[in-house]
Design a protein with these regions (language model features):
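Rhodanese-like catalytic fold shared by cysteine-dependent sulfurtransferases
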Residues: 3-6, 17-40, 50, 59-90, ...
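Sec-dependent N-terminal signal peptides
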Residues: 6-12
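A solvent-exposed beta-alpha-beta segment
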Residues: 44
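Structural scaffold elements adjacent to functional motifs in cytosolic proteins
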Residues: 52-54
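Short, surface-exposed ligand- or partner-binding patches at beta-edge/loop junctions that are enriched
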Residues: 95
């Protein structure tokens, strides 16, 4: 009986630890719907408070992207962190096509100490006014 209790408590501690580690990596990532992103982009004062990173591939970005965004693909984001490190304490919005790559990019940014990450609806999920 004592052995089963020890095993159970050990398992419980591992679960609690893994959940708390996972929560830390995502607590700084906030979902943002497309209408909120468009409102920010259309307001000159608000727009200056955010860095918008399109994490799609270059050819996807060139085909059409939200205004005022920069392109750093999800594959490159870790190696190009130094280019955006001034934004660690500021608002960073990541966007892609469907939300999968932007979520990955957001997690990478949190891992590198970024505090305020917004994961916006992808360009296939919201009817953004794209520019080329």
């Amino acid at each position: 009986m004592m052995k089963k209790t020890c095993i159970f408590l050990s398992f419980l501690l591992m679960v609690i630890f893994s959940v708390s580690c996972n929560a830390k990596s995502t607590e700084n990532i906030i979902r943002m719907d497309g209408s909120r992103l468009e409102a920010i982009l259309n307001d000159e004062t608000e727009r200056g408070k955010y860095l918008v990173i399109d994490v799609r591939e270059d050819y996807e970005y060139k085909a059409g992207h939200v205004p005022y965004s920069i392109n750093i693909s999800v594959q490159e984001i870790e190696s190009r962190i130094s280019e955006i490190s001034d934004w660690k304490e500021k608002n960073v919005i990541v966007i892609c096509r469907s939300g999968r790559r932007s979520r990955t990019a957001a997690e990478i940014l949190v891992k590198h100490g970024f505090k305020k990450i917004f994961d916006a609806d992808g360009v296939s999920k919201y009817n953004y006014k794209l520019e080329k």
